């Protein structure tokens, strides 16, 4: 299958590498010139569960897409605030048969995608895989993970199941979900706790879990997400979601991982996606007249940190 990874950072590199290993024709597209140059010159290098691998993949700079060949599937991994620009830039690769799978962190991205892609070709999901970048063209890929996905509108269930099958053939453990909005909110609770808290506290997830207030902070933030989700007909099982979030503390699985927001801001001095995670809950709280004080404050803290570090 001809697959384009739109946003080839840490997670895009993981999916690109695994789909390439699975026999698909993969093209990476990214906006970081040094990263694209490194992959063109040396291949995508990865520490893959302790094994050093190099994959020679097609790669293009987002602002200089030369290919006019249409793609079968686009997997969106760009940063949320860059989604609209990415979709503009990859328009030449999209036709009426191109499927678009959004696996971005956060809530409500389909509203942006619909401006460029017909609803019957849009699929949304989330992933529990983790990944890191050690530098341009160099990924660190440890642990196991999974993907859940669903068609945006009814009638495309079989296509969604086929996409899950294609991803699973490359070891990505994908499955069809008939309630993806629940899964997206559940995953957003992971990001809404681990990302902001680890970034502000300058620790990995296991370190956060060792602090005495960690459990109370997780419970409070999950309750804020759940209160907003209820207004969108998503009823989170709060106890189950809290338990799920706190599995991230385990150092024998992914606890030693630094979340993507930490990598963006603390390691790479980049702006974060906080406005699409806790910030989204904060905005929706105002819309639905629901108090979200922890999400409000965490959003302000992260933006303050961005300013202090002069993130770009």
UniProtKB/Swiss-Prot annotation:
Keywords: Cytoplasm, NADP, Oxidoreductase, Pantothenate biosynthesis. Its EC number is 1.1.1.169. Coiled coil: none annotated. This is 2-dehydropantoate 2-reductase. Catalyzes the NADPH-dependent reduction of ketopantoate into pantoic acid. InterPro entries: 6-PGluconate_DH-like_C_sf (IPR008927), 6PGD_dom2 (IPR013328), ApbA (IPR003710), Ketopantoate_reductase (IPR050838), KPA_reductase (IPR013752), KPR_N (IPR013332), NAD(P)-bd_dom_sf (IPR036291). It holds the Pfam family ApbA. GO terms for cellular component: cytoplasm. It is found in: Cytoplasm. Pathway: Cofactor biosynthesis; (R)-pantothenate biosynthesis; (R)-pantoate from 3-methyl-2-oxobutanoate: step 2/2. One of its GO terms (biological process) is pantothenate biosynthetic process. Substrate binds at residues 105, 191, 195, 260.
């Amino acid at each position: 299958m001809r697959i384009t990874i739109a946003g080839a950072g840490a997670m895009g590199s993981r999916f690109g590498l695994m789909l390439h290993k699975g026999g698909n024709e993969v093209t990476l597209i990214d906006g970081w010139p040094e990263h694209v140059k490194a992959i063109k010159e040396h291949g995508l290098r990865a520490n893959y569960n302790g094994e050093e691998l190099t994959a020679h993949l097609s790669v293009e700079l987002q602002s200089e897409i030369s290919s006019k060949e249409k793609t079968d599937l686009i997997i969106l991994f760009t940063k949320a605030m860059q989604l609209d620009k990415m979709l503009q830039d990859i328009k030449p690769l999209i036709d009426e048969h191109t499927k678009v799978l959004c696996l971005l962190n956060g809530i409500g991205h389909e509203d942006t995608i619909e401006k460029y892609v017909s609803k019957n070709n849009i699929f949304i999901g989330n992933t529990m895989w983790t990944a890191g970048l050690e530098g341009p063209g160099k990924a660190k890929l440890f642990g196991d993970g999974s993907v859940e996905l669903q068609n945006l509108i009814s009638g495309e269930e079989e296509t969604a199941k086929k996409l899950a099958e294609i991803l699973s053939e490359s070891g990505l453990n994908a499955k069809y979900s008939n309630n993806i909005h629940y899964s997206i909110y559940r995953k957003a609770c992971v990001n809404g706790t681990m990302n902001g808290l680890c970034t502000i506290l300058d620790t990995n997830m296991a370190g956060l879990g060792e602090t005495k207030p960690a459990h109370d902070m997780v419970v409070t933030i999950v309750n804020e997400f759940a209160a907003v989700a209820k207004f969108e007909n998503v009823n989170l099982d709060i106890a189950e979601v809290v338990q799920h979030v706190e599995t991230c503390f385990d150092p024998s699985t992914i606890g030693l991982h630094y979340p993507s927001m930490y990598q963006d801001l603390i390691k790479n001095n980049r702006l974060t996606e906080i406005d699409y995670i806790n910030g989204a809950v904060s905005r929706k709280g105002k819309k639905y007249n629901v108090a979200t004080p922890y999400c409000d404050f965490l959003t302000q803290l992260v933006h303050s940190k961005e300013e202090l570090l002069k993130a770009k």
